[in-house]
Curated annotation (Swiss-Prot):
Membrane topology: Single-pass membrane protein
Domain of life from the UniProt record: Bacteria
InterPro entries: YmcE_antitoxin
Protein known as: Uncharacterized protein YmcE
Ranges annotated as spanning the membrane: 18-38
Organism of this sequence: Escherichia coli (strain K12)
Signals that turn on the gene: Transiently induced by cold shock in a PNPase-dependent fashion.
Any one Gene Ontology cellular component term annotated for this protein: plasma membrane
Keywords: Cell membrane, Membrane, Transmembrane, Transmembrane helix
Length: 76
């Protein structure tokens, strides 16, 4: 079972944006505590500042900051 981590103190980095209702559990793979690979978005990696479930649904609400490609490659 996947664990979804949400932080109480939300710090929004510059350039952060909100994504909601499109992240289905079967399309999201957590590879570290604060990094997601969104398969439905062509495996683009996001640094997650805030992540929580949307009550009563199978979706997530996340505040994301898109990582640069060189940052993504360094994780592998």
């Amino acid at each position: 079972m996947r664990r979804w981590i949400s932080q109480n103190n939300i710090r929004l980095p510059r350039g952060a944006f909100f994504i909601s209702a499109l992240f289905f559990f079967n399309a999201v793979c957590i590879v570290s505590d604060n990094l997601l690979i969104i398969e439905s978005f062509g495996e683009m990696a996001y640094n997650i500042s805030y992540l929580t479930r949307v009550p009563g649904t199978n979706t997530l609400l996340a505040c994301c900051c898109l990582l640069r490609p060189e940052e993504v490659n360094s994780e592998y």
